[in-house]
């Protein structure tokens, strides 16, 4: 798995299951084979997406009729993608 996949799995668990981000992040990073740079990116994506969730939802709702009708997994992908585009300036292309 790459850093974005790891981050998305963590975000899904936190937002859908109510898991604690720090515990899930620690476990997933320890279980992964990511290098330090990718671990740092995954950490930033998780904490940043969760921290900016309300702002990201406002941005998404400008383009979607009813955000509550979206599947959770799709919504979290959009949140993470928009977080990267709006708040990170040195993220490598996928």
Where would I find each of the regions flagged by the language model?
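Class I Rossmann-like S-adenosyl-L-methionine
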Residues: 1-94
